[in-house]
Amino acid sequence: MVKDLRTQAVDMKLHRLPKLQAAQWNLTHAQPFFPSLEQLFKTETLASMADYGIKLPEEVESVVDATHIKTTKGQTLEVHRKTTMILSPFKTMKGEYSAPGLPKPAETAKSYSEQMQSPHTAAYVGALASSALSTSECPHFPRVYGVYAAMATKHEVNISDDYEELCDRKWFVDNIGKTFELRLRGEGGEGFTHTRGQRMAVQVGEDIDLDAEDVTVEAVPEPTVEDVVEEYELPSDSEYSEESESDDEDVYDILSCDCSERSEDEEDDESAGDDEFAWATFTEVPVVTTVMEKCEGTFYELMKTTDDAQKHTAWVAQIVFALAYAQRNFGFIHNDLHGNNVMYVPTAEEFLFYRHHGVTYRVPTYGILMKIIDFDRATFSVKLTGMKEPRFFMSSQFKPDEEAGGQYNIEPFHDSKSPRIALNPSFDLARFASSMFWDMFPEGPTQKTDHPLFEMFKHWTTLPDGSSVVFRKKGDNHDRYHGFDLYKAITRYLKESAVPRKEISKFNQYVTTVSPTTKVLVIGE
């Protein structure tokens, strides 16, 4: 196992839950069972397995309305539901799965069954990670009140980031109104255009001749879960040079940016990157919904509304301690940690206490308790009490033909034709720093500032040769890698720069001998 990714035994249990009426959530046939549970629990002797799910400290008793539940402890709570399609939204839009309940060609049936039944399907992995982290002692993950697989009578997926590329696919235009409905922000009003490239909205029925080739990728067979033990050899400096050495790309290639200057269009694209403007709506599709506590806002929003460096540092310290705990107990890597995947709730606790190798840390909250969310791309292990070996779970998003393909190359999605790329415990903090740096320090790496996070973020994104995974060597305030190439570069090249447990020492200003006033979160003794 990668040395900084460890597991500790956890006391999770399975129990039978009553049927949930979830029509107000546009769900039918809701059940707490999903296939990942069979990897953890002995289920052979259980009747009506669909009625069994993970036992949580406080659970959904009934649905009050779209945003509220009544719990088994008698509380009426406002909640957030993260709902994820089990089948690939894009393959569903393309019509690859055929009509539900009807016979399918052998390859289609194989792909459909694999996605529905694999313990590594992204929707299941996200739900299991949420449940496991919720039942742990760490307060920095949302409380979960229930997980349900169900049929959604209506489900909407944000496709804004992919809209421009999708519009270049003939099947996308052809299938509007057939396999999905398309909704655009401002549709029906004047002046709506696509913010990236100013693309006009596609009109249903419009004759468009798109010179695009549809490529059918063979389904990846269901592999066995094996231990992730092999490290990827650190490449030479030439392997992460500024220029690509080959035009013959594959999913594992990494391309750095070699354009001469930062264009106005690029800046506009980045500023608009978080805008939501396009959604695909599906009917009667299988989903997993995770019912969790409602958070108040994101870390990104906090940075935009608060300029206090002491607060920023204390809140980032919470994130570092949370990740160190998750790596120590679940071998957990989030794999998509950015400013909007860290949220917060208000807290009355003035300080939080952590203990690492006998040292106690007293971190001020300033009224904010950070919560890390969204685990559909996670990799982690769960070891139940009494288990000899942990069970490893890896999101299906890491299949070579899926959205995170090329970041790792390990079981259960190992491609024997390409070098092995192991899990990287530095990934989360490096990705987090790269996502927030320009917003917090817009003048770039040469900015004059005494903000404690400035040098810390630069360290987390520095390669062994002293260059940055974020900035080009030219020092021109231009991103070195764009899009998913950044994810692959962090995984491949940053090995020791941002391991959470090793970064705890950077927060020695919080070391204390004061007796804890709240429960201490133990990271490692």
Task: Kindly label every feature range from the protein language model.
Residues Y232-L234, E242, D248, D253-L255, ...:
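Catalytic activation segment of kinase domains across protein kinase-like and atypical kinase folds
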Residues D65, Q75-V79, C138-R143, P286-T290, ...:
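Core residues of folded domains in eukaryotic genome-function proteins
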Residues G74, T84-S88, A149-A152, C295-G297, ...:
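Conserved beta-strand elements of beta-rich interaction domains across eukaryotes
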Residues L17-G95:
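ATP-binding glycine-rich phosphate-binding loop
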Residues F90-G101, P139-K311, V382-E389:
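Conserved structural core of kinase catalytic domains
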Residues A129-L133, T306-H334, G339, A348-E349:
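Conserved kinase catalytic-core helix
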Residues M1-S36, K42-E44, A404-E525:
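Helical subdomain adjoining the active site within ATP-dependent kinase catalytic cores
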